[in-house]
Amino acid sequence: MTEANMRRAVFLDRDGVINRSDMREGKPFAPLRVEEFDILPGVAEAVAALKDAGFLVIVTTNQKDVGLGLASMEVLEAMHDKLRAEVAVDDICVCICGDHCRRYKPNPGMLLDAAREWDVNLAVSIMVGDRWRDVDAGKAAGCLTYFIDCGYTESLNQTPDHTVSDLPEAVRHILKTLSV
């Protein structure tokens, strides 16, 4: 497929962007139980607006706790069933490995694999996340980056293209500034 015929996507991190993170000592952690998996306000509407504008919406999430045995694959799948039921995402890409894996953010592997699978042009696509790993993965994949500043104690390695307070604000900015 030629670049002109390829699709545009918005890649979304999961924890802290779509659902509430468990905060400990200024750092975000993924929920470990389905009952802790709460979709943030305005997320379903924001994703619907992106889809109405013609974007694919693909979740890219590191879930190292599953790989370490701290959370189960069954719980992760139940969370993603809940996510799919409440938010109209096109795909959910998961890496349970850890830093050594090419798919584990900040490495761009999940974005590159999804782009291949969905015929996505990364040069006109966007990564939205709440951590330095998301910004770095988006930059490495050649995407525009939006950083959701949740006030975490960790710093960024690279400067995001845009900084916003939540996903609905990011989507308003994307739809206002990018021709679709």
Question: What label would you give each PLM region?
Answer:
Residues V43-H80, V89-G98, G138:
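Substrate-recognition element of Asp-dependent hydrolases with the DxDx(T/V) motif
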Residues V17, K64-D65, R133:
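Short, solvent-exposed loop/turn segments at secondary-structure junctions
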Residues K27-A30, D65-G69, G98-R102, E154-N157:
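A short acidic, helix-capping loop that chelates divalent metal ions and anchors anionic groups
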Residues D22, T61, C93-C95, I126, ...:
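Short loop/turn and capping residues at structural boundaries
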Residues T2-R8, M73-D91, H100-M127, R131-V180:
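Asp-based, Mg2+/Mn2+-dependent phosphohydrolase catalytic module
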Residues T2-I58:
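Active-site neighborhood of HAD-like aspartate-dependent phosphohydrolases
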Residues V34-D38, A71, R102:
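Short, surface-exposed alpha-helical recognition segments that flank or form part
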Residues N19-S21, G26, L68, D136, ...:
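Conserved protein kinase catalytic core
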